[in-house]
Amino acid sequence: MFLRLFKYLWPERYLPEAKKGDPFENPPTPLHSRTGVLMVNLGTPDAPTARDIRRYLGQFLSDPRVIEIPRYIWYPILFGPVLTFRPKKLAPKYAGIWMDGGSPLLVWSQRQAEAVTAQLREDGFDVPVALAMRYGNPSIADAITGLRGQGCDRIVVVPLYPQYAASTTATAVDAVTRHVARLRDQPALRFIKRFYDHPGYIDAQAARIADFWNMHGRPEKLVMSFHGLPRYSIELGDPYYRDCLATAELLRAKL
């Protein structure tokens, strides 16, 4: 027991001769830093089958950030009728929109990540970009492992939600930090919380709308639709509703 303790306290005295010396003389990893980007979207089933949809819904709907009611009330409902019957009903609908590369969300998210990679290279930045899904694949764990394998010891995490909500952005942050907490050599993390009012985002949205108007004519009214949240989420402090109003007003002014 004492020998093990001494080896722990003074390992250099018990290491073979070849392993002694300055530990920084031949470091196991490069000392320079490299930044990577992790883009996180919501998630998707792996295939438009009841089995894969059930797995996806189980992950998604068991997240306490998404369903904020007591587990003892919700779980019997979720693992009873919801996961028993809902996947079979959804499978034909998923199959109807499925693309060659997977679900539309996955395909377009991958294209978005590729476009960000290309833009960074064009701007002169050697920055790896990885895509992850909060629920399903590609997983956050695999994406971080991939970035670490490319030498990234700093990771900028970008949840792909312009407006902040606990059920979207916060749960992505939870998942990333939970995985990194298990690592011995942890990368430095920086999170982009939201970008609802960023000029680049507003300009991009305005340009898409203007392009549509140029092709089809300018309508009398423009309806801006955002994903909904339960009222209690707003009452508990989610800034999502305010963010949506601000985005709409900025777009209105831009157009």
Regions found by a protein language model. Give the residues of each.
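Active-site-proximal alpha-helix that buttresses catalytic centers in soluble enzyme cores
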Residues: 2-255
